[in-house]
Amino acid sequence: MANTPKTLIAFVFSVIVIISYVHCHTTIASAPSSGEPTTYATGPALSKHSHDNDGICFVTPACFAPGQYEIGCIVYCHESHYKHYKCVNRSCCCYNTDKNASELK
């Protein structure tokens, strides 16, 4: 098989697209571990967003620069069956748990 310029350009373009897709869709939030401070989300910062204020907060790099990397907080809260999320200071707060989480899986 001859390596024509069209084949090489198509291959390089494909590699660039795959790398950029993977790079743009990574998350940096990790699940809270026993070493990280975890608190219950009952503070006044969340009261205007939730009536129940049932949830957890944990420190994560996803909320160090709010607006840029909040996708990690969103993904973690969604996969943990919380309805809402919010970055409060440097913490990701997930709250208002889905009552029928067992039915979602």
Curated annotation (Swiss-Prot):
Its main location: secreted. It is found in: Secreted. GO terms for cellular component: extracellular region. The keyword Secreted applies. The keyword tRNA processing does not apply. Keywords: Antimicrobial, Disulfide bond, Fungicide, Plant defense, Secreted, Signal. GO terms for biological process: defense response to fungus; killing of cells of another organism. Disulfide bonds join C57-C94, C63-C87, C73-C92, C77-C93. Residues 1-24 form the signal peptide. Belongs to the DEFL family. This is Defensin-like protein 106.
